[in-house]
């Protein structure tokens, strides 16, 4: 019962995080966007956070459905996420193309509904979520110029506009 509750909480993060955080102009979101755009170490930490969520999902799902072979199929995706360089490259490539984002979203929905492929769908959902919150090239190029802002509102507006472009 506890594993089922943990599994539901972990899976619900895919739905609740974008709802409360994506495109918001709060101070926490602006700080998150600025740190992700400026620091390679923060992007690596973000990749490791994604890996931890995927592994936690696998552990709870395997405890619930022991005879299911779905976690074995999605383990390949989890193994790909172990290397920070590959994770960053994967997230950057997914973020760069709207058609790839749409394809992975549709694939995640289809595999979630397919028998035995639920874990693959949730893993793809986590990868899609991480790619959406990954900084765009626009903000990375803008931050390299070290712009000077006169007030916080200007920083907030530019950050949110360029980060999610």
Which sequence ranges carry the predicted segments?
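Membrane-helix interface and helix-disruption motif detector
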Residues: 1-8, 56-73, 90-93, 110-125
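N-terminal signal-anchor/start-transfer transmembrane helix
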Residues: 3-30
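Hydrophobic core of alpha-helical transmembrane segments in multi-pass integral membrane proteins
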Residues: 14-18, 50-56, 76-79, 128-130
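Cytoplasmic membrane-interface regions of multi-pass membrane proteins
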Residues: 22-37, 80-99, 141-147
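Membrane-helix boundary elements
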Residues: 32-67
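Small-residue-rich segments of transmembrane alpha-helices in multi-pass membrane proteins
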Residues: 43-52, 97-113, 153-160
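Alpha-helical membrane-associated segments of multi-pass integral membrane proteins
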Residues: 95-148
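Short, highly charged, low-complexity non-transmembrane loops/tails of multi-pass membrane proteins
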Residues: 138-165
């Amino acid at each position: 019962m506890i594993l089922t509750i943990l599994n539901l909480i972990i899976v619900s993060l895919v739905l609740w995080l974008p709802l409360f955080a994506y495109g918001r102009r709060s101070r926490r979101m602006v700080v998150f966007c600025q740190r992700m755009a400026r620091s390679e170490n923060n992007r690596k930490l973000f990749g490791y956070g994604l890996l931890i969520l995927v592994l936690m999902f696998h552990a709870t799902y395997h405890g619930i459905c022991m005879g299911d072979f779905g976690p074995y199929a999605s383990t390949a995706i989890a193994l790909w996420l172990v290397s920070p360089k590959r994770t960053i490259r994967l997230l950057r490539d997914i973020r760069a193309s709207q058609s790839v984002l749409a394809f992975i979203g549709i694939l995640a929905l289809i595999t979630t509904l397919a028998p035995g492929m639920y874990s693959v769908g949730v893993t793809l959902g986590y990868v899609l979520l991480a790619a959406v919150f990954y900084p765009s090239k626009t903000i990375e190029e803008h931050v390299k110029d070290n712009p000077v802002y006169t007030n916080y509102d200007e920083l907030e507006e530019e950050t949110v506009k360029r980060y999610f472009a």
